[in-house]
Amino acid sequence: MKQDHVNEEQSALWNGPSGRAWVDIQPSLDRLFEPFATLLADAAAASSARAVLDVGCGTGAVTLEIARRLGADAQCTGVDISARMIDAAHERAKRSGLRVHFVCADAQTHAFVPASVDLIVSRFGVMFFDDPVRAFANLRRAARTDAALRFVAWRSALENPFMTTAERAAALLLPDLPPRRPGAPGQFAFGERQRIAAVLSDSGWADIAIEPVDIGCALPEPALNDYIGRLGPVGLALQRVDDTTRRRVVETIRNAFEPYVQGADVRFDAACWLVSARAPSSAA
């Protein structure tokens, strides 16, 4: 970690159990979030960008899809705090034969080459900074004048009941389950439009647009047990309980997800923000 101990909690999480889980069930998660990879890749393909930075790239799905769209002369780089996920991204890149670059680093503090990219994207990767203004100011320095910023982030927990189903169903069986802290780094840190606007404005971005989007997503039904048992606050809590409790919790949560099961898939609508902004000149 950096000497000022930035994002230590998130680094421990994503270099530990959460990172392992994402790597292990990567194909299912890729399918779950594929509509958002397509959304960002479409935006990249419609732009004139030739140097793209994917923030919080995870195992590389978005970075690789953009590289496919833009062709061999584009420079596509993914950055993530999780060494385990970056290792998986490197392996995917080798198999794909695509020309991409992955960096294990904290985008909040990493010394990016100044004015080196003309498009910055992120699929659910920018809600985890402990100082988001500092993070987006750092990304702004990496951007060339008039570079575009495009990212998707979750709207509020209230608007995303699927994402809190496990916590609500397990609450009585896991009384020590930590509550989500409003505004804290995590999935719903950017749930409020006003906060996103303030963060981007305070960090030097211009022409900010924040659009609500609702997109249908699907998870293969056989992957539901891993989704329940390994991801999110419940997944972390289940590592600390005995086998009997774990079985009871998973069974209870699976029953709570039944309304979302449609044949071979688990389906839900994701309530998100599609955010765009522009990097003004340093003199602006």
Give each language-model segment a name.
Residues 31-50, 65:
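Conserved alpha-helix/loop element of class I SAM-dependent methyltransferases that forms part
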Residues 51-110, 134:
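Class I SAM-dependent methyltransferase SAM/SAH-binding core
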Residues 70, 93, 170, 200, ...:
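Conserved hydrophobic residues forming the short capping helix/wall of the S-adenosyl-L-methionine
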Residues 133-134, 140-141, 148-219, 238:
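Conserved catalytic/acceptor-binding region of the Class I
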Residues 118-132, 155:
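A short SAM/SAH-binding and catalytic strip from SAM-dependent methyltransferases
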Residues 108-119:
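A short acidic, Gly/Pro-enriched loop at the edge of an enzyme's catalytic core
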Residues 3-4, 13, 18, 25-26, ...:
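Conserved Class I S-adenosyl-L-methionine
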Residues 71, 129-130, 143-145:
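Helix-to-beta-strand junctions that scaffold the AdoMet/dcAdoMet cofactor pocket
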